């Protein structure tokens, strides 16, 4: 519950948690990439002078599951709560929402602990998330600035009604404050480097995530990205510093040693992307590889692959999503099949077919067997003609997809 009083001026002790997903066998499943948001938020809050601890998803996975997955999670969290935390925050997405909801409701929370949920899923279903859990506050949208304001407000026992971007319980009522706008480039560049010192020694991670931009300049109809037509790219110097920081902490991950750019579109500003890759090549040569996401439109412009350091890329993921022109128009992809094939020929000429990775979606609401077959025919042609890996996924209706 939201406590009636904190000690004004006293320090705040915060616990940040991201629960793992459950697989088809109902067992907890580890991912290969660490939850960047958790470690970034830890640094932000520590810079404000607060005490922060993290429970990484892999710590739940590595426990002996003598009972069910939820009980395993509840047991570990309740043991940690004995340390006495003022605020406990959960990072929530659609895939871990089910287990997060159950765990939050099964924990016996102390009266002086505030429970906060953040992430895309609860940002969309904020009121429902409060009505169905013991959580006190929902953090909507980008959370770094909102978290700082929220913790300061709770610390000073001030009203919550001035904090943009939160939904909260007030007695039997649910209050939804106005939205907070997207963070500016200046805001993003002012963020401290992620708190990788808190990574568990034993972990399954194979790549270090780095954020060089947020948002997307486009607005595909199926996409869950919250900030459309609002791409914000960090300057090259900032990006290189973040990569260097990740490189210094490569020893903290158990396997691998590559960088994963978590940007929704690394190639959005082609000249900037090339400058970043060139600078990284000067720093590390071919010692490290980089995962990036790109758009066919950027490849067609000719700028992105001009002087491209092919040996630096571990994977270049490109979202195509639909294998026929009518479908591409419906999802507002801004692409035709003819343009796709032209872009793939450029990729082939640059010797990048082996690292390219195309994604497709089947089962859009308007599709039938005939239209799905068109996409599968396109995929078959690409694999046979260009030797490029294609991934086909069923359409999944997730928050903000429509």
List the predicted regions and their residue ranges.
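Radical SAM [4Fe-4S] cluster-binding motif and immediate context
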Residues: 33, 186-355, 362-364
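Catalytic cores of alpha/beta
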Residues: 128-131, 366-380
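Short helix-capping segments at alpha-helix termini
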Residues: 49-50, 107-113, 158-159, 281-288, ...
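Glycine- and acidic-residue-enriched helix-capping/strand-helix junction motifs
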Residues: 25-38
């Amino acid at each position: 519950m939201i406590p009636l009083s904190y000690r004004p001026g006293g320090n705040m002790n915060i616990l940040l948690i991201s629960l793992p997903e459950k697989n088809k066998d109902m067992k907890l499943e580890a991912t290969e990439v660490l939850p960047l948001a958790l470690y970034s938020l830890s640094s932000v809050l520590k810079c404000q002078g607060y005490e922060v601890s993290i429970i990484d998803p892999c710590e739940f996975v590595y426990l002996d599951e003598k009972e069910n997955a939820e009980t395993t999670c509840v047991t570990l969290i309740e043991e940690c709560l004995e340390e006495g935390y003022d605020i406990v925050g959960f990072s929530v997405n659609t895939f871990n929402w089910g287990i997060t909801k159950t765990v939050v409701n099964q924990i016996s929370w102390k009266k002086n602990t505030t429970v906060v949920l953040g992430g895309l899923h609860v940002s969309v279903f904020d009121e429902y998330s409060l009505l169905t859990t013991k959580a006190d506050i929902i953090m909507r949208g980008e959370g770094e600035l909102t978290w700082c304001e929220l913790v300061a407000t709770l610390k000073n026992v001030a009203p919550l009604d001035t904090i943009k971007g939160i939904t909260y319980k007030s007695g039997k009522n649910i209050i939804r404050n106005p939205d907070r706008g997207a963070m500016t480039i200046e805001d993003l560049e002012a963020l401290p480097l992620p708190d990788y010192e808190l990574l568990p020694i034993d972990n399954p991670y194979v790549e270090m995530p780095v954020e060089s931009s947020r948002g997307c300049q486009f607005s595909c109809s199926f996409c869950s990205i919250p900030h459309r037509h609002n791409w914000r790219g960090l300057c090259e110097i900032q990006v290189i510093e973040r990569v260097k920081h990740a490189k210094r902490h490569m020893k903290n991950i158990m396997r691998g040693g590559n960088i994963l750019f978590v940007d929704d579109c690394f190639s959005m500003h082609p000249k900037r992307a090339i400058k970043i890759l060139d600078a990284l090549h000067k720093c590390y040569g071919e010692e490290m590889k980089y995962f990036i996401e790109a758009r066919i439109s950027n490849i067609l412009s000719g700028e992105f692959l001009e002087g491209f350091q092919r040996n630096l890329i571990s994977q270049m993921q490109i979202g195509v999503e639909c294998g026929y022109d009518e479908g591409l128009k419906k999802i507002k992809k801004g692409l035709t099949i003819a343009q796709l094939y032209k872009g793939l020929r450029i990729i082939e000429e640059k010797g990048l077919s082996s690292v390219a990775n195309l994604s497709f979606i089947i089962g859009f609401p308007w599709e039938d067997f005939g239209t799905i077959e068109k996409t599968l025919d396109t995929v078959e042609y690409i694999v046979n003609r260009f030797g490029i890996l294609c991934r086909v996924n069923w359409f999944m209706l997730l928050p903000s997809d429509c």
